[in-house]
């Protein structure tokens, strides 16, 4: 018969795995008939194929009803343990993560990940291999479960988790616990599974609900311990938040099978539809859609689903990694039937309802802790809470009384039904957790008729006075106030005050095991604390420090709940409070029903009350507890330092009396039905009501529950008072329940039909759904099963007793009713007593008949129910077989995972001894390896935890004594280390090897010594050790003793050391001996660990202070290295030498300095330690401190006189070593104290080079600031280090900016060009962006310099290059326009300005210049017409007043002009700063900021750049060589001053606008302000060579050069220039072009760079003058002479080329009016103006091609057509006719210097100072031979000067827009 029962549908089950249809069919098999079950009519389930059937067909395992949705974690479910093991605190190593089956776990997550996209928050390095989000989520969960840290950014938001879980589960994985064991996934029934039960086969194998203790188990039953290990509840679904499936349109998907309602409970967590199915769900059962694409399959339950796995039931469940957080999901958000619908209650912590297969992108890490979701069934929509104000007031006073020793909390004590739960619920409802409380309709037996929609929201209104209700009833219904407003106010204040302090709460419910377990309590409280708005800082901390979340993971809570609560909750909260991140107020945690938790007391471990007693002393004083407990359980809280408040002293306490009266009055007055039923004649007056009220209150004895149920009977008309004796009124709760049952079950047979249901509900460890109960009932039938409709009728009859909760599970209406069904007091009527044993039997049969394997949890639960059912009682005599063997056969036939269940996490840490014995009898392997303590065998784990009874059981069944974990430790080692003396004795008596060594070479004796267990050590010495020579893996006793001495000394166990030193001769140890394990003496070990007491003890026993350890280190060095100065003092007092040196020549001072122990250093110096001692490497104490970066020690040693320039054997100073380490502050300190910054060691390295080599960015910046020079080694070391390289380049630019600011244009240009040469060509990828920005800045700065030296062609070219990099830069267009205007290319300038205006229409400066240029274009046309008629003076602009008066000196003119320009346009002059937007992470923004700070004060911005190729050069070639003529100073002044007036104001206003309005990047420091350009633009440029053609055929070159080269230089670029978005590249190009160009400009280009400052009106007629061959102006068109027309700097406008090439010096000056403004600053740094104007005039056809010398950035004067060294096109090079290429740098230097007239002072003075008499006709004759001669003479001088100008920096102040237009 047993076999028939067990094997029924076994075949079907197995087949079911393969064939979807072979589920339970109508076929019947013999079934055991249990007591009452036989009466139930039998009906077989139809075979309709629907989702229901599918789920069964797939072999879904069924477990006890936990939540209907209880997803069952097949194999994955872990059992949780309730209690902390008694063993010593485990080290982290013991908490190692169990192994996870790879494929099972990872594959599903891979799938899940596909649809997800990482959130933008998860910024990943592009090159980093990135794992899929799913994989990350998996890792995160693994981290939690395993107790490890969580990978950052892998957290899934609670909402998304839900959906992710769905998918993951369908793959067969428990979303919450990737750790669990073998089979991957919880079944759909598992709380962590959001799928239908039909989803996965593996899931079916194990049901999460394995429980052992029945809810009805009494406290003395040890089996109940198993319950403690249970972790799942009907709330699981709630917890997982995914109990419901939603269709696309948002409707619930419900599947029905044969009338069975499959609608799973809606997500209680869903914000909206939580309560959805209250009424309508049943009527509307839309067909469940299960399209794959739609997401998780709709949940459909078949009969099998009735047996859903209840998540964690008995202790041993998951293979787990216990972390089946999912099953917790449900739980944690398990409904609080108390109408408390907390905010997170919507869908498990806020999960999104729609579980379509959409995956939201992963969000940044979130809290993965989930609170249990509580639901108190007896709280109904009509419950009211009246009174109790006195109680709240009293609690408040007591908690606020700081003098009270018992103010750590309050205990509310009361009998059953006295309103304890209502009080807690009221506080929760008004707290931060009750803002979205939802009233849950309940059908409690006495609840008064409902007049409102049961699902309506009823909020606790803070305005109401708290109304009291029965213990289970507290709702928001507003009581009609029976208390006056005055009295109400202060009372309300008390309840509000307390509620405002509530940060967490917990309800213990006996019929929901999880709520009674310590691990769940810890985890849930932590989760609620995170959600409390007062503790937002705690939440932030958990997000920031994932290891804290890991510490609070369920797995950690099971293994050591005390440590988890202390380290994960109390310590972080205390620290936050100390840091003032938590408001300085008091906070409260509420716990209801501690007595209920006692019902599930485990064999080992704490109950909730003992746990609180153990941990309360660790609570901070500001965190209080308010707990409730039943009066007959007061002893469990007797040790708590709490104030006790009783609700029991009914007759004496007037407040209680008034509360009860107020409640009755309220109910009577609010219901006409009650009024009419309590009055004899239908008319009730106040007297009558008062009498009835007094009678009821008297009968109640203080019980609100009694009053509520009695008044409900009056309200429904079941009771009517017919006489004044009130005999009809029941006198007790027991009578009330009897009356209700009699009304419900008119006959005994009616009750017997319902009895099996009650039995199952009583036996179950968790609330069960109707489907689960249905499965259990039918499991007891062999033939004809009960029909669903019949079953539903019975359930309807019981609906007032078994309240349906939000998750569709059923819970007893009140704990007292549950107890009444099981137990009656003597003399009470025994009608309606139930037999939970039969319920256990039905549940056991349900598990036995379940298809597929049971998981660990289900197996434990099955064992629990088998033991509780005890169906073989009395059969042993008949059969001859003991009942225990029959039970073992039963469980053996029913499941295969006995060993895994035995070793499940909960069963290890809170073992259920009886169920474990049953599992072992059934065949479980007692040597099975666990997932903890390095995969130790079960015996090792239990020995470590000190579970003596379990160890005895394992040894009884033959567990291997010498089985080891992976680290080689045996059970004896674990027991000795943990200090379990009884187990050590037990194991040694059984014959375990005492001398066994683990993999670290330690035996049990050493383990006991390390942890200070002297008694065990002495006991082990008395045991028998292996005789003879030690075998491999064993140890001699003498060696073990020496090791034990070292071990005890190192850990400071002085008692053990004393014991060992006092051993008799047989066991004598050598006090100076070195052990064979660590090689330490006892003294070196103690000194190194800072154990002062032990050191003194050892020295007292004759330990030698000079005795070294195996490595030759004496005790003094051990102590100094670890900073234990007290021990150093002790050793010095015992005769040690303070300057003792070791083998390397190091002294204790060096060792202490090296380790950074300042106090020890100070102590040693005070004792005479030599500061100047050097070790064998030549390093001093200061050197060591610098090398290790200990700044405080460095400062102290320097102050004490340490030599700061001491070099070691390699020539390194402390500064070198500090630069190597990388502490910038130490480096700065040493430099300030006089360290030589340019010191070179023996290998040729300087401190800067070392810092660069080690990539110590902050040190590099610090040294550069202090003036470190950049040598070849520095650049070599910076190669391939973009972050360092950009710092060096910025340093060069900074130096150039300083030069520019000082007016040294030549030196500035050299710096800029040198920087350009150092730019990396490629290879940095993203890191190139900051380089490109910097390059743009340099180009703009160079363009600025060129215009300052009147080299307009080059200026134009540089601006063009900036434009290539940043095509949308209006500043670049503006700059190029200025250059073109200066070279009189008005049309091209006009085009550029128009572009600039388009890009920045609001810039006034640009508009002003545009208007001026338009006017000048008109003037030019007029002047050309006049020129045809004859040489006439050029018409004057209104803004340009030119005079004919000759000006005596050039230098004055320039001086004044320059000054004026600087004054008027400081912004314009500021050198373009480095781009501020630094996209590349490699360049520290702080550095750029620092550099810019230095650059931002002085200097002028550079003019904007324009596009190349806009204007053709207007200049014509000069036919004949001649002397270089310079216009007079006045003539030049005239030109400058013409537009100063209008320009100045514009500069000031415009400059700021430019910066603001520039849409591209921020300004760059120095001559050219550059707006950031899009990355990516590139241009090719050759930095080393340039071809200069000086031929007339190159007119178009000017167009190409565009902006910066007004001089018609032809800069043939070897490659086409491609403007790209990248700022830096272009800059680089521009700079390199310019740099080379400047340096290489050949003499033959001496295009008449006359004082091109003179601004000419449109037509400049030369008033032919003495012997000048032609008096008409020649527009040098960038051809042979490349004359840079009379335009010099940005400050003045160039109307056209002013320079004329004449054969003779022109002596007369054209007259014209001009304003002369004095100039005080040297122009381009050159006071002698002649240099600026010397024009180079070489044979027109020669072209020079010279590599520009690095660093020689010369400024071309008078725009003498410099040609960019980067030839743009070879064809252009040919134009000149000659391809003479300069061969050497000297030539380039020469040409550059010549080119920059500013450099050749001699030339300037001797050959070029030729005054120009007529401004209009200022004609300079360039004499080529003189020029060549001067060039050759000046070459060396120039190159030297160039090098000198290398280092200097300037600070830019304003944007580069030029104002003197």
UniProtKB/Swiss-Prot annotation:
Q: Detail the disulphide connectivity of this chain as listed in its UniProt entry.
A: none
Q: Where is the composition biased (Low complexity)?
A: 461-480, 1421-1431, 1467-1485, 1659-1689
Q: Give GO terms for biological process.
A: dendritic spine maintenance; myoblast fusion; regulation of postsynapse organization; visual learning
Domain of life of the native organism:
Eukaryota
GO cellular component term, pick one: dendrite
Write out the biased-composition intervals (Polar residues): 206-219, 440-455
Q: Where in the cell is it found?
A: Postsynaptic density
The answer to keyword Membrane applying to this record is no
Q: Where is this region: Disordered?
A: 1-46, 63-99, 206-225, 257-311, 439-486, 1421-1485, 1636-1696
**Record keywords, A-Z:** Acetylation, ANK repeat, Phosphoprotein, Repeat, Synapse, TPR repeat
Q: Where are the ANK repeats?
A: 896-928, 934-963, 967-996, 1000-1029, 1040-1069, 1078-1107, 1111-1140, 1144-1173, 1177-1206, 1210-1239, 1243-1272
Q: How is it modified after translation?
A: Phosphorylated; by MINK1 and TNIK upon stimulation by RAP2A.
Ranges of Basic and acidic residues composition bias in the record: 8-21
Which InterPro entries does the annotation name? Ankyrin_rpt, Ankyrin_rpt-contain_sf, Dendritic_Spine_Reg/Scaffold, TPR-like_helical_dom_sf, TPR_rpt
TPR repeats by residue range: 1289-1322, 1336-1369, 1371-1403
Q: Which residues carry this modification: N-acetylmethionine?
A: 1
List Phosphoserine occurrences by residue.
63, 66-67, 207, 270, 465, 1439, 1668, 1676-1677
Q: What family classification does the UniProt entry report for this protein?
A: Belongs to the TANC family.
Q: How does this protein assemble?
A: Interacts probably directly with DLG1, DLG4, HOMER1. Interacts with DLGAP1, INA, CAMK2A, GRIN2B and GRIA1. Interacts with TNIK. Interacts with MINK1.
The task this protein performs is described as:
May be a scaffold component in the postsynaptic density.
Name of the protein in question: Protein TANC1
Q: Which organism is it from?
A: Homo sapiens
Gene designation:
TANC1
């Amino acid at each position: 018969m047993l076999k028939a029962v067990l094997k029924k549908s076994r075949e079907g089950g197995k087949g079911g795995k393969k064939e979807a249809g072979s589920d339970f069919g109508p076929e019947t098999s013999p079934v055991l008939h249990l007591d009452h079950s036989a009466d139930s009519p039998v009906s077989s389930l139809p075979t309709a194929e629907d989702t229901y059937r599918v789920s069964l067909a797939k072999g879904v395992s069924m477990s006890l009803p936990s939540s209907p949705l209880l997803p069952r974690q097949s194999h994955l479910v872990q059992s949780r343990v309730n209690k902390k093991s008694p063993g010593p605190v485990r080290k982290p190593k013991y908490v190692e993560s169990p192994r996870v089956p790879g494929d099972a776990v990872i594959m599903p997550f891979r799938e899940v990940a596909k649809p997800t996209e990482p959130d933008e928050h998860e910024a990943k390095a592009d090159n980093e291999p990135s794992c899929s989000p799913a994989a990350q989520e998996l890792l995160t969960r693994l981290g939690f479960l395993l107790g490890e840290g969580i990978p950052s950014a892998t957290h899934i938001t609670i909402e998304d988790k839900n959906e992710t879980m769905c998918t993951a589960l369908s793959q067969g994985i428990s979303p919450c616990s990737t750790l669990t064991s073998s089979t991957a996934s919880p079944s759909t029934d598992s709380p962590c599974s959001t799928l239908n039960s039909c989803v996965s086969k593996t899931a079916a194998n194990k049901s999460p609900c394995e429980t052992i203790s029945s809810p009805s188990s009494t406290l003395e039953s040890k089996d109940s311990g198993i319950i403690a290990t249970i972790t799942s509840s009907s709330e699981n679904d709630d917890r997982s938040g995914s109990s419901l499936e939603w269709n696309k349109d948002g409707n619930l998907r419900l599947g029905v099978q044969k009338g069975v309602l499959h609608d799973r409970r809606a997500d209680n967590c869903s914000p909206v539809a939580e309560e959805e199915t209250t009424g309508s769900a049943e009527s509307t059962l839309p067909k469940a859609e299960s399209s794959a694409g739609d997401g998780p399959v709709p949940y459909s339950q078949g009969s099998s689903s009735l047996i859903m796995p209840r998540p964690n039931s008995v202790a041993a469940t998951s293979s787990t990694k216990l972390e089946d957080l999912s099953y917790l999901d449900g739980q944690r958000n398990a409904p609080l039937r108390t109408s408390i619908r907390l905010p997170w209650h919507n869908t498990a912590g806020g999960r999104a309802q729609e579980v379509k297969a959409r995956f939201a992108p992963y969000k940044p890490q979130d809290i993965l802790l989930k609170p249990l979701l509580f639901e108190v069934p007896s709280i109904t929509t009509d419950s009211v809470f009246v009174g109790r104000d006195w109680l709240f007031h009293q609690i408040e006073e007591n908690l606020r009384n700081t003098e009270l020793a018992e103010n750590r909390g309050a205990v509310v004590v009361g009998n059953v039904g006295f309103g304890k739960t209502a009080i807690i619920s009221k506080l929760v409802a008004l707290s931060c957790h009750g803002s979205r409380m939802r009233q849950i309709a309940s059908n409690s037996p006495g609840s008064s008729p409902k007049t409102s929609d049961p699902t309506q929201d009823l909020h606790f209104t803070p305005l109401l006075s708290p109304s009291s209700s029965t213990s289970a009833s507290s709702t928001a219904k507003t009581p009609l106030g029976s208390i006056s407003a005055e009295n109400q106010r202060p009372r309300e204040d008390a309840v509000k005050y307390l509620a405002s302090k509530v940060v967490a709460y917990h309800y213990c419910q006996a019929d929901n095991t999880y709520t009674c377990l310590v691990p769940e309590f810890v985890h849930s409280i932590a989760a609620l604390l995170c959600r409390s708005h007062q503790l937002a800082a705690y939440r932030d901390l958990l997000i920031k420090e994932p290891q804290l979340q890991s510490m609070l993971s369920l797995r950690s809570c099971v293994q050591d709940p005390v440590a988890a609560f202390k380290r994960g909750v109390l310590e972080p909260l205390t620290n936050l409070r100390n840091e003032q991140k938590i408001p300085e107020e008091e906070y409260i945690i509420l716990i209801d029903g501690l007595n209920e938790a006692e019902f599930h007391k485990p064999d080992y471990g704490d109950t909730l009350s003992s746990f609180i007693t153990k941990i309360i002393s660790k609570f901070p004083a500001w965190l209080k507890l308010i707990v409730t407990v039943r009066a007959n359980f007061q002893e469990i809280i007797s040790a708590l330092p709490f104030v006790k408040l009783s609700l029991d002293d009914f007759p004496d306490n007037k407040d209680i009396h008034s509360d009860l009266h107020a409640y009755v009055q309220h109910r009577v007055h609010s219901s006409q039905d009650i009024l009419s039923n309590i009055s004899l004649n239908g008319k009730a007056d106040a007297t009558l009501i008062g009498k009835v009220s007094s009678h009821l209150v008297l009968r109640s004895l203080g019980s609100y529950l009694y009053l509520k149920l009695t008044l409900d009977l009056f309200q429904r008309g079941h009771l009517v008072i017919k006489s004044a004796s009130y005999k009809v009124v029941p006198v007790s709760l027991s009578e009330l329940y009897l009356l209700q049952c009699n009304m419900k079950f008119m006959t005994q047979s009616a009750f017997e039909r319902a009895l099996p249901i009650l039995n199952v509900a009583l036996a179950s460890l968790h609330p069960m759904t109707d489907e689960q109960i249905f499965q259990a009932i039918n499991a007891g039938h062999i033939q004809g099963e009960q029909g669903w409709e019949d079953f539903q009728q019975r359930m309807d009859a019981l609906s007032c007793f078994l309240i349906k909760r939000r998750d569709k599970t059923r819970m007893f209406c009140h704990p007292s009713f549950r107890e009444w069904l099981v137990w009656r007091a003597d003399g009470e009527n025994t009608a309606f007593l139930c037999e939970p044993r039969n319920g256990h039997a039905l549940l056991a049969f349900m598990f036995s008949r379940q298809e597929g394997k049971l998981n660990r949890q289900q197996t434990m639960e099955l064992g629990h129910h088998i033991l509780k059912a005890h169906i073989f009682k009395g059969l042993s005599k008949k059969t001859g077989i003991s009942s225990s063997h029959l039970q073992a056969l039963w469980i053996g036939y029913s499941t295969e995972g006995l060993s895994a269940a035995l070793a499940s996490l909960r069963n290890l840490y809170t073992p259920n001894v009886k169920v474990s014995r049953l599992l072992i009898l059934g065949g479980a392997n007692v040597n099975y390896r666990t997932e903890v303590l390095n995969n130790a065998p079960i015996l090792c784990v239990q020995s470590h935890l000190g579970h003596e009874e379990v160890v005895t059981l394992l040894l009884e069944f033959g567990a291997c004594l010498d089985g080891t974990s992976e680290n080689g430790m045996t059970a004896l080692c674990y027991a000795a280390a943990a200090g379990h003396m009884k187990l050590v004795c037990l194991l040694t008596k059984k014959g375990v090897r005492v001398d066994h060594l683990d993999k670290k070479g330690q035996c049990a004796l050493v383990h006991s010594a390390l942890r200070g267990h002297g008694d065990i050590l002495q006991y082990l010495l008395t045991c028998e050790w292996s005789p003879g020579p030690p075998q491999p893996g064993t140890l001699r006793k003498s060696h073990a003793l020496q090791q034990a001495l070292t071990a005890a000394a190192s850990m400071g166990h002085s008692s053990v050391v004393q014991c060992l030193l006092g051993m008799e001769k047989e066991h004598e140890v050598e006090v100076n001996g070195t052990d064979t394990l660590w090689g330490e003496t006892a003294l070196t070990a103690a000194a190194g660990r800072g154990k002062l007491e032990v050191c003194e003890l050892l020295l007292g026993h004759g330990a030698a202070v000079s005795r070294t350890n195996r490595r030759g280190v004496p005790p003094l060095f051990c102590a100094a290295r670890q900073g234990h100065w007290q021990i150093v003092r002790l050793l010095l007092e015992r005769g040690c030498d303070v300057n003792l040196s070791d083998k390397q020549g190091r002294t204790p001072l060096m060792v202490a300095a090296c380790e950074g122990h300042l106090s020890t250093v100070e102590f040693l110096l005070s004792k005479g330690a030599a500061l100047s001692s050097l070790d064998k490497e030549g390093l001093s104490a200061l050197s060591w401190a610098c090398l290790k970066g200990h700044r405080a020690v460095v400062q102290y040693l320097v102050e004490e006189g340490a030599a700061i320039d001491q070099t070691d054997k390699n020539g390194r100073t402390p500064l070198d070593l500090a630069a190597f380490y990388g502490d910038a502050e130490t480096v700065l300190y040493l430099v300030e104290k006089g360290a030589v910054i340019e010191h070179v060691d023996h290998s040729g390295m300087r401190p800067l080079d070392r810092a660069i080599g080690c990539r110590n960015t902050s040190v590099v910046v610090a040294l550069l600031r202090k003036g470190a020079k950049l040598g070849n080694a520095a650049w070599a070391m910076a190669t391939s280090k973009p972050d360092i390289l950009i710092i060096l380049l910025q340093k060069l630019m900074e130096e150039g900016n300083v030069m520019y600011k000082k007016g040294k244009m030549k030196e500035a240009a050299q710096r800029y060009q040198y920087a350009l040469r150092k730019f990396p060509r490629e290879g940095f990828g993203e890191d190139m962006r900051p380089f490109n920005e910097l390059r743009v800045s340099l180009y703009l700065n160079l363009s600025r310099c060129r215009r300052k030296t009147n080299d307009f062609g080059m200026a134009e070219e540089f601006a063009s290059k900036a434009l290539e990099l940043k095509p949308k830069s209006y500043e670049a267009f503006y700059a190029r326009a200025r250059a073109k205007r200066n070279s009189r290319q008005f049309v091209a300038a006009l085009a550029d300005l128009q572009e600039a205006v388009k890009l920045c229409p609001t810039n006034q400066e640009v508009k002003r210049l545009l208007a001026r240029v338009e006017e000048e274009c008109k003037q030019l046309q007029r002047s050309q017409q006049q020129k045809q008629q004859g040489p006439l003076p050029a018409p004057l602009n209104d803004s340009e007043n030119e005079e004919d008066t000759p000006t005596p000196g050039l230098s004055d003119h320039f001086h004044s002009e320059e000054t004026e320009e600087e004054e008027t346009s400081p912004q314009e002059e500021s050198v373009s700063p480095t781009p501020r937007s630094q996209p590349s992470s490699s360049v520290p923004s702080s550095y750029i900021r620092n550099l810019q700070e230095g650059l931002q004060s002085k200097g002028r911005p550079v003019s904007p750049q324009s596009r190349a190729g806009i204007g053709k050069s207007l200049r014509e070639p000069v036919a004949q060589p001649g002397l270089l003529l310079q216009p007079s100073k006045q003539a030049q002044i005239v030109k400058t001053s013409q537009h100063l007036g209008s320009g100045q104001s514009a500069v000031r206003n415009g400059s700021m606008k430019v910066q603001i309005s520039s849409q591209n990047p921020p300004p760059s420091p120095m001559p050219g302000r550059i707006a950031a350009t899009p990355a990516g633009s590139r241009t090719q440029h050759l930095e080393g060579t340039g071809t200069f053609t000086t031929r007339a055929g190159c007119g178009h070159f000017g167009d190409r050069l565009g902006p910066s080269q007004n001089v018609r230089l032809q800069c043939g670029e070897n490659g086409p220039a491609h403007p790209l978005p990248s700022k830096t590249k272009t800059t680089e190009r521009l700079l390199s072009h310019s740099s080379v160009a400047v340096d290489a400009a050949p003499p033959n280009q001496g295009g008449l760079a006359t004082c091109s400052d003179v601004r000419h009106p449109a037509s400049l007629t030369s008033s032919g003058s003495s012997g000048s061959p032609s008096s008409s102006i020649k527009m040098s068109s960038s051809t042979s002479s490349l004359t840079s027309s009379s335009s010099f700097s940005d400050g003045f406008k160039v109307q056209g080329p002013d320079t004329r090439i004449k054969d003779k010096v022109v002596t007369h000056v054209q007259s014209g009016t001009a304003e002369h403004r004095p100039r005080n600053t040297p122009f381009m740094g050159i006071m002698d103006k002649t240099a600026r104007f010397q024009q180079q005039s070489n044979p027109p056809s020669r072209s020079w091609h010279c590599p520009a010398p690095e660093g020689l950035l010369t400024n071309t004067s008078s725009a003498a057509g410099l040609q960019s060294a980067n030839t743009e096109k070879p064809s252009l090079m040919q134009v000149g006719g000659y391809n003479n290429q300069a061969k050497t740098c000297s030539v380039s230097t020469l040409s550059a210097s010549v080119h920059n007239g500013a450099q050749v002072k001699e030339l300037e003075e001797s050959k070029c100072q030729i005054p120009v008499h007529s401004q209009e006709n200022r004609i300079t004759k360039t004499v080529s031979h003189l020029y060549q001669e001067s060039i050759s003479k000046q070459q060396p001088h120039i190159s030297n000067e160039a090098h000198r100008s290398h280092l200097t920096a300037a600070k830019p102040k304003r944007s580069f827009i030029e104002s003197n237009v």
